[in-house]
């Protein structure tokens, strides 16, 4: 196992926490964004913000 200094361990912990934050709060908006940019399947109506909010 590699010996890491206390400062290096803290930096790695910050990096992992930042990655977890980005994944947790960015996944759903990314999926919604990709859904809007790729468009609907053929034969389906185009998605709109109102249909997203009110079903």
From Swiss-Prot:
Membrane topology: Single-pass membrane protein
Annotated Gene Ontology cellular component terms: mitochondrial outer membrane translocase complex; mitochondrion
Listed GO biological process terms: positive regulation of protein targeting to mitochondrion; positive regulation of type 2 mitophagy; protein import into mitochondrial matrix; regulation of protein stability
Pfam families: Tom7
Membrane-spanning segments: 21-40
Compartments reported by the entry: Mitochondrion outer membrane
Residue intervals annotated with topology Cytoplasmic: 1-20
Mitochondrial intermembrane side stretches: 41-55
Keywords: Membrane, Mitochondrion, Mitochondrion outer membrane, Protein transport, Transmembrane, Transmembrane helix, Transport
Similarity field: Belongs to the Tom7 family.
PANTHER family with a match to the protein in the record: MITOCHONDRIAL IMPORT RECEPTOR SUBUNIT TOM7 HOMOLOG
Main function: Required for assembly and stability of the TOM complex. Positive regulator of PRKN translocation to damaged mitochondria. Acts probably by stabilizing PINK1 on the outer membrane of depolarized mitochondria.
Subunit field text: Forms part of the preprotein translocase complex of the outer mitochondrial membrane (TOM complex) which consists of at least 7 different proteins (TOMM5, TOMM6, TOMM7, TOMM20, TOMM22, TOMM40 and TOMM70).
Protein name, UniProt field: Mitochondrial import receptor subunit TOM7 homolog
């Amino acid at each position: 196992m590699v010996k890491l200094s206390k400062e290096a361990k803290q930096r790695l912990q910050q990096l992992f926490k930042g990655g977890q934050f980005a994944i947790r709060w960015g996944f759903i908006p990314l999926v919604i964004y990709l859904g809007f940019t790729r468009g609907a399947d053929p034969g389906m109506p185009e998605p709109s913000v109102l249909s997203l909010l009110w079903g």
